[in-house]
């Protein structure tokens, strides 16, 4: 959420930075609400100070010998009671304006980092680096073709069970999914991450804190009777782990890793990636999440990205790193690196992880602070996929396919899968 003080003191900066995202905003209405809220706050504070002064004066006069039931003291007490009534009215008005202002601000995205390159769309994203040698050969199959030939998944039965964009994994496919999850969790916990297994159902406050609500409600599945939602990413419950908390500065950074099923409606993606594992309503993902001191978030962004890259390197999967431009940033992000893995069958790079620094945007929405001595301030948060399991499996199938119909797996997976090949059954 945007800083209300910044809205009052420097609205031009907000307009300029949102303009870098391609937004043309008129903040006049928000500024008016913020000014009214600030004026009410000042009037209330002034009246409270006057009420405290009168209360103190009552005590002093009684101590000096005035009759506690006399007219002099009664008049002061009457003034004090009248002030209390006015304060109560102002508090109610102030709460209403504060809630209105918060509701309006919740719909605005984060301001981009100064380091984020300007641009209008994904065409303006900047390639940062590449790793590995992409396999380029004629006649390579796409992952869904390989998966069907090896009987790894069944989409027709999944439609019968649920609907389109769901898959059921069988045999080697189910084993490989489990192996990848365990491999990734072990890799990250070996680097000091604390493993978390969060709830799959989250409340509206959690989705609001991470930035999914109110703007993206149509993209998630909701259990309306209970005010619960199927989580679209473990980023949501991980953000709320410390909602409404003050984290001592000597405990930072906090680094969490979580496996969770993820659920997305994929609104607006009709006709795209209709086969295979790339775009599903339900998929598994291992998520990385950091809470850091504000002064260390840029450094942490490089580190969390490197941790996501380490998975691809261990699995011997070629990839490239893109820095997203301002016009392609996610709602909560101030700066983002996308990792795109090479899919040899498709002959293209596809996104497999987004690693974002969200500055204090999520922390302000979730009231997550840190305290260093007498100073209390909002933390910074970061998140990144480490990695999406289905897309990782797709990359392994396409890059490891062999002429005999088998798929060669990287050595790092052998202890988890039990052998180095997927064989036709």
UniProtKB/Swiss-Prot annotation:
This is Serine--tRNA ligase. It comes from Synechococcus sp. (strain CC9311). L-serine binds at residues 233-235, 287, 385. Residues 108-134 are annotated as: Disordered. Keywords: Aminoacyl-tRNA synthetase, ATP-binding, Cytoplasm, Ligase, Nucleotide-binding, Protein biosynthesis. It is an enzyme of class 6 (ligase). GO terms for biological process: selenocysteine biosynthetic process; seryl-tRNA aminoacylation. PROSITE patterns: AA_TRNA_LIGASE_II (PS50862). NCBIfam families: serS. Catalyzes the attachment of serine to tRNA(Ser). Is also able to aminoacylate tRNA(Sec) with serine, to form the misacylated tRNA L-seryl-tRNA(Sec), which will be further converted into selenocysteinyl-tRNA(Sec). It holds the Pfam family tRNA-synt_2b. The gene is serS. GO terms for cellular component: cytoplasm. Residues 117-134 have a biased composition (Basic and acidic residues). ATP binds at residues 264-266, 351-354. CDD domains: SerRS_core (cd00770). Belongs to the class-II aminoacyl-tRNA synthetase family. Type-1 seryl-tRNA synthetase subfamily. GO terms for molecular function: ATP binding; serine-tRNA ligase activity.
């Amino acid at each position: 959420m945007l800083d209300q003080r910044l809205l009052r003191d420097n609205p031009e900066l907000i307009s300029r930075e949102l303009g870098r995202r391609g937004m043309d905003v008129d903040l006049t209405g928000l500024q008016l609400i913020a000014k009214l809220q600030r004026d009410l706050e000042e009037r209330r504070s002034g009246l409270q100070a006057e009420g405290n002064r009168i209360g103190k004066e009552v005590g002093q006069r009684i101590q000096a010998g005035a009759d506690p039931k006399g007219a002099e003291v009664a008049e002061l007490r009457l003034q004090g009671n009248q002030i209390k009534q006015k304060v109560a009215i102002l508090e109610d008005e102030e709460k209403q304006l504060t809630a209105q202002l918060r509701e309006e601000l919740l719909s605005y995205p984060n301001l981009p980092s100064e380091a984020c390159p300007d641009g209008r769309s994904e065409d303006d994203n900047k390639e940062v680096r590449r790793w590995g040698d992409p396999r380029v050969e004629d006649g390579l199959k796409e992952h869904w073709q390989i998966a069907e030939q090896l009987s790894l998944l069944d989409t027709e039965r999944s439609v019968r069970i649920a609907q389109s964009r769901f898959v059921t994994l069988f045999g080697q496919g189910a084993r490989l999914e489990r192996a990848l999850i365990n491999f990734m969790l072990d890799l990250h916990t070996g680097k000091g991450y604390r493993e978390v297994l969060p709830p799959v159902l989250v409340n509206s406050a959690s989705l609001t804190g991470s930035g999914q609500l109110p703007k993206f409600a149509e993209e998630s599945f909701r259990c309306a009777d209970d005010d619960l939602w199927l989580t679209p990413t473990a980023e949501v419950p991980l953000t709320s782990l410390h909602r409404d908390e003050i984290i001592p500065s000597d405990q930072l950074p906090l680094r969490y890793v979580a496996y969770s099923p993820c659920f997305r409606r994929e609104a607006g993606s009709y006709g795209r990636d209709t086969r295979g594992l790339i775009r599903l309503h339900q998929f598994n993902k291992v998520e990385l999440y950091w809470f850091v001191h504000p002064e260390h978030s840029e450094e942490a962004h490089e580190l969390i990205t490197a941790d996501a890259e380490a998975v691809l390197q261990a699995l011997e999967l070629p990839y490239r790193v893109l820095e997203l431009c301002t016009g392609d940033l996610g709602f909560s992000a101030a700066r983002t690196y996308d990792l795109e893995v090479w899919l040899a069958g498709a002959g293209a790079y596809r996104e497999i992880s987004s690693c974002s620094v969200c500055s204090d945007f999520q922390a302000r929405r979730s009231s997550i602070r840190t305290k260093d001595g007498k100073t209390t301030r909002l933390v910074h948060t970061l998140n990144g996929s480490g990695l999406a399991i289905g897309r990782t499996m797709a990359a392994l199938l396409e890059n490891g396919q062999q002429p005999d119909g088998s798929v060669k797996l990287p050595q790092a997976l052998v202890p988890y899968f039990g052998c180095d090949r997927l064989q036709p059954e």
